[in-house]
Design a protein with these regions (language model features):
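Generic beta-strand/beta-sheet core signal
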Residues: 2, 6-7, 29-31, 43, ...
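Short helix-adjacent coil turns
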Residues: 108-115
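Core structural elements
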Residues: 31-33, 53-66, 87-100, 117-140, ...
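Acidic, turn-prone loop/beta-hairpin segments
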Residues: 72-102, 134-223, 231
């Protein structure tokens, strides 16, 4: 790519980009697209992709949760379902969430926001949305308030709330809105996302063997889908 220059007429108006795409998608793109010490090859299509894939996916995941939580009047008032009594799918995503907390905390402490943002993005798109919500959606449909359904609500709520806190240094406006919308009903926190304590990983919830087994299942599934597309079946 060429260096932006008024003389060459290839400069991008930042205010126009913010107006059209939003400041948080722009900030997320610039931070996750390249390391701070590397040159950034700016592409407006990349900002649009971040807005659609990451922020759009996170919004859709929250909207899915909010739809059924409102129907069932879920307010996180019930006692926590014990971790070891939750289904394996819940224990898997919570294990990944706590592994994510460790990785993101370490990245921020080492002034590596690029690594932090990429880890969060991968968790939201690949694991939380593509796998956890897709495999768990039927659990929210039933009319009865079972322990399994409560576990599903508590698990997804915890993931969304934690992601909003982890992401807030990079996307302060969007994540504060997400955090506020979540807590508007539950009242778990009375302040905004930027004043809460940063999450601390619960080592007892991290199960690397479970993460590896699920990762293998994801790879096998992706390979099978790829073969099906190849032979058009």
């Amino acid at each position: 790519g060429n260096k932006m220059s008024k003389r060459l007429g290839n400069a991008v108006d930042p205010f126009d980009t913010i107006e059209k795409q939003g400041s948080d998608p722009l900030r997320w793109y610039m931070i996750t697209n390249s390391q701070p010490w590397d040159n950034l090859k700016f592409d407006i299509a990349g900002v649009e992709e971040v807005k659609r894939k990451f922020f759009g996916t996170l919004y859709n995941t929250y909207s899915f949760f909010a739809l059924y939580a409102n129907i069932d009047n879920f307010k996180y008032a019930e006692a926590e379902v014990p971790f070891n009594e939750r289904p394996e799918i819940d224990r898997w995503i919570l294990s990944l969430l706590n592994s994510l907390i460790k990785e993101v905390t370490e990245a921020y402490e080492k002034y590596e926001p690029t690594r932090a943002g990429r880890a969060i993005q991968d968790f939201v798109i690949e694991n939380l949305s593509n796998w956890y919500v897709r495999l768990s959606r039927k659990r929210y449909w039933g009319g009865e308030q079972t322990a399994d359904k409560l576990s599903a609500y508590q698990t997804l709520y915890t993931c969304l709330e934690t992601v909003s806190i982890l992401s807030s240094p990079i996307a302060p406006f969007y994540m504060d809105r997400l955090f506020t919308d979540l807590n508007k009903v539950t009242g778990r926190y009375t302040t905004d996302v930027h004043l809460v304590d940063f999450p601390v990983a619960n080592e007892s919830m991290i199960d690397k063997q479970l993460e590896e087994r699920m990762n293998m299942a994801q790879q096998i599934s992706s390979m099978v889908l790829g073969l099906r597309r190849k032979v058009q079946i």
